[in-house]
Amino acid sequence: MNRLIVLFLIVTMICATIAVPSREELEDQKEYKRSAALAGTIIEGASLGFQILDKVLGELGKVSRKIAVGVDNESGGSWTALNAYFRSGTTDVILPEFVPNQKALLYSGRKDTGPVATGAVAAFAYYMSNGHTLGVMFSVPFDYNFYSNWWDVKVYSGKRRADQGMYEDMYYGNPYRGDNGWHQKNLGYGLRMKGIMTSAGEAILQIRISR
């Protein structure tokens, strides 16, 4: 009997020393799981915002030139990824293959690894179920003494992959400066665009495509 009492006391002491996660700690763990590996995925379109894109930036680590991109599909149709073309820099993720209506794609880019003078400059393309191509361009330069952040969105007739020509068409066309302000325009084909890009070297680009 005495042995059982001693054993019970020992087990009780051991259990008392085991840390039980608090509610706050459990919430932090859930939040970490939700935010892990966001770039290259699809989320609910209504949930896209700066908070999500900040987490995408955080995934890229301590990189001086990087960008988190979110594009909300409210076009009424579905999109299929074609490709991404990087004029400068690179990415660690693949474009989400399929973006249904009312979903948003998350993507990211960064400068090349090492002490190299590159930014994150690219264009990517999605083939839309209406038979046309959605092109997105962003430019986060290395040297802000000569360049600024720029971005644009354009719809191309038919199917067209992203390449240097698509990038230059938007970059040298009439792009929007990354000025921390909202911009909108008519894309044609019954679609509209509204978006914003921040001005820093760790940039956020949020876009909404709608009817």
UniProtKB/Swiss-Prot annotation:
Task: Please list the residues that make up the propeptide.
Answer: 20-34
Q: Name one GO molecular function term.
A: toxin activity
As given in the record, the signal peptide range reads 1-19
UniProt keywords, alphabetically: Cleavage on pair of basic residues, Cytolysis, Ion transport, Membrane, Nematocyst, Secreted, Signal, Target cell membrane, Target membrane, Toxin, Transmembrane, Transport
Q: Where is this region: Plays an important role in the hemolytic activity?
A: 37-46
| Predominant location | secreted
Kindly list the residues the record flags as site (Interacts with the lipid membrane): R177
- Site described as Important in the initial contact with the lipid membrane, located at Y147
| Binding-site list for phosphocholine | S88, V121, S139, P141, Y167, Y171, Y172
This protein's GO CC annotations: extracellular region; nematocyst; other organism cell membrane; pore complex
Report residue spans for region: N-terminal region: 45-64
Residue ranges, annotated region (Trp-rich region, which is important for the binding to lipid membrane): 139-154
Task: Report which superkingdom the organism of origin falls in.
Answer: Eukaryota
Motif Cell attachment site, crucial for protein stability is found at 177-179
From its record, what is one biological process in GO terms? Answer: cytolysis in another organism
Location of this chain's protein in the cell = Secreted; Nematocyst; Target cell membrane
Q: Which InterPro entries match?
A: Actinoporin_PFT, Anemon_actinoporin-like, Cytolysin/lectin
- Other remarks in the entry: A synonymy between H.magnifica and R.crispa is controversial.
Question: Partners and quaternary state?
Answer: Octamer or nonamer in membranes. Monomer in the soluble state.
Quoted from the entry, the domain comment is: Composed of a long N-terminal alpha-helix and a core region rich in beta-sheet structures. Before the pore formation, the alpha-helix binds the lipid membrane, partitions into the lipid-water interface and stabilizes the monomeric molecule on the membrane. Finally, it traverses the bilayer, thus forming the transmembrane pore.
Query: What does this chain do?
Result: Pore-forming protein that forms cations-selective hydrophilic pores of around 1 nm and causes cardiac stimulation and cytolysis. Pore formation is a multi-step process that involves specific recognition of membrane sphingomyelin (but neither cholesterol nor phosphatidylcholine) using aromatic rich region and adjacent phosphocholine (POC) binding site, firm binding to the membrane (mainly driven by hydrophobic interactions) accompanied by the transfer of the N-terminal region to the lipid-water interface and finally pore formation after oligomerization of monomers.
Family named by the database record: Belongs to the actinoporin family. Sea anemone subfamily.
Protein name per Swiss-Prot or TrEMBL: DELTA-stichotoxin-Hmg2a
Source species, please? Heteractis magnifica (Magnificent sea anemone)
Its ancestry begins with: Eukaryota, Metazoa, Cnidaria, Anthozoa, Hexacorallia
